[in-house]
Amino acid sequence: MPSSAQVLLCLAAVLAAAAATTAEAHSQCLDNPPDRSIHGRQLAEAGEVVHDLPGGLRAYVSGAASSSRAVVLASDVFGYEAPLLRQIVDKVAKAGYFVVVPDFLKGDYLDDKKNFTEWLEAHSPVKAAEDAKPLFAALKKEGKSVAVGGYCWGGKLSVEVGKTSDVKAVCLSHPYSVTADDMKEVKWPIEILGAQNDTTTPPKEVYRFVHVLRERHEVPFRRQDRRDGPRLHGQLVQQAPQLNEACTAPTRLNSINHSSAVIFCFDSWLPRLIFMATTSSTTVISLIFFVSMYFFSFLFAFL
């Protein structure tokens, strides 16, 4: 028969396991969910939702489809309908990009009523990255230079895509489940936007990412975790600051700074085509005229 000390030890182990399970069940990924009662018209969304994209996906798209530069953004666990996410998308699109935000989660977004572990098993970002290949292939077939970015859950998807030849640049914002080992396989320039008080991917883990990338030499990278940046995991896309009274002015500034950071990342590393599809017909005609004049003047010089 077990002694009282053994019983107490066993009970302590059970309580510790229960506490660990509870801690694991809660994640910063679930903090500050977006207000889904806010509609696109209230935010003056510039884009639209399209259906039947390659891979059977629907998506929020913004920007000129004729642009030679495309960005695929992967949402966090709350999905592609988050109001602030769409505002960020519109800002990036305004900078000259065609931006696609697929509904990788297919309407099954995470909330506090669902088991986090079970939900993740049903929504593997690694599998989602594989399923997205037809979309990336279609964008490349159109002659576009393609980049990928992601938030939280979407950060893991993005880093998986960054291991392939499907894109030319990667941007991670407070990623979830990304490891230093992932950095050993990334093939393209990568930007890592961390949060100061992120327990999901804390600054120390981001430093490990940087260490691996620095040792590799061949992959350009940047890390941003400035003091004026986001302080919490998911802070950038899980709220709608201009409509949420509880949201502070610094958060509004963070969203603006973040849009600029994402644009800066892609402007730095995503190649521009010489003849951009957005070039005006007048510019093209003028260019052809001057090239022709140069050619004929060169020809007549030898006649």
UniProtKB/Swiss-Prot annotation:
It holds the Pfam family DLH. The keyword Glycoprotein applies. Its main location: secreted. Residues 1-43 form the signal peptide. Gene3D superfamilies: alpha/beta hydrolase (3.40.50.1820). It is an enzyme of class 3 (hydrolase). GO terms for cellular component: extracellular region. It is found in: Secreted. It comes from the Eukaryota. Glycans are attached at residues 115, 197, 257. One of its GO terms (molecular function) is hydrolase activity. Its EC number is 3.2.1.-. Glycosylated. Keywords: Glycoprotein, Hydrolase, Secreted, Signal. Plays a role in control of plant growth. Mediates specific degradation of cell wall (1,3)(1,4)-beta-D-glucans and is related to auxin-mediated growth and development of cereal coleoptiles. This is Endo-1,3;1,4-beta-D-glucanase. It comes from Zea mays. The lineage of its organism: Eukaryota, Viridiplantae, Streptophyta, Embryophyta, Tracheophyta.
